[in-house]
Amino acid sequence: MKKVLIYSRTGCHLCEIAIDKINSVRNEKNFQVEIKLIDRIHDLEEKYGEQVPVIFIDEKIHDYWRVDLERFIKDINT
């Protein structure tokens, strides 16, 4: 089963949209999702703070800012 990790920040509107899109295909495509708030994790906040949401699939960066759902599904299926 694939694992999706989303770096997010409190109050991030783009993060909410990305999470909703990813969750909309979660049951159909059968993958795990973890959402990690990076607000108080200095090294992650410094590295990714301006790029959230950051989406990883199986520990590899998939996307920043917005989710292209078609590409996401393609990558989840491979």
Which role fits each region the language model picked out?
Residues 31-42:
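Thiol-based oxidoreductase modules, predominantly thioredoxin-like and allied folds used
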Residues 53-60:
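A short, hydrophobic beta-strand/beta-hairpin element that forms part of a small beta-sheet core
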Residues 25-29:
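A short, Lys/Arg-enriched amphipathic alpha-helix followed by its capping loop at the start of a domain
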Residues 1-24:
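Local sequence-structure signature of Cys/Sec-based thiol-disulfide redox active-site neighborhoods
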Residues 1-3, 75-78:
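Short, Lys/Arg-enriched, disordered terminal segments
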Residues 48:
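Surface-exposed interaction regions that form or flank ligand-binding interfaces
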